[in-house]
Amino acid sequence: MSVQEDNKQDFGSEHWPEEIRYLSEDKTLVVRFDSGETFTFPAEFLRVESPSAEVQGHGPGQKQIVPGRRHVGIMAIEPVGNYAVRIKFDDLHDTGIYSWQYLHKLGREQNDLWQAYLDHLAAAGLSRDP
């Protein structure tokens, strides 16, 4: 996937993907940005950090813990205009629209977000396993 240089300002994103590739065997999504940064996202991580209201809630402090997604995969990745992708997971979740900004943020904060997720699972007595 490539994005034209002159479209960057139109959508208010300072980070644009140069390549988005799903590795089905590893269940990972690789996103390479024009900044030179490349992030590898496990499908499970993207699922539990979905930007959908179902996961994030409708306001601060409403984020839901999504357990049991250790083996989730991605069925489809669809472009949404020039600013995002919709990821369809094999657990049938498909309401998250991942903007370039959000994907870049997830990449930069992946370790901290993943640890927070694991901590919340443990505190709630929940598991990554289905």
Label every model-predicted segment.
Residues M1-P130:
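Motif-centric detector for short Cys/His coordination patterns
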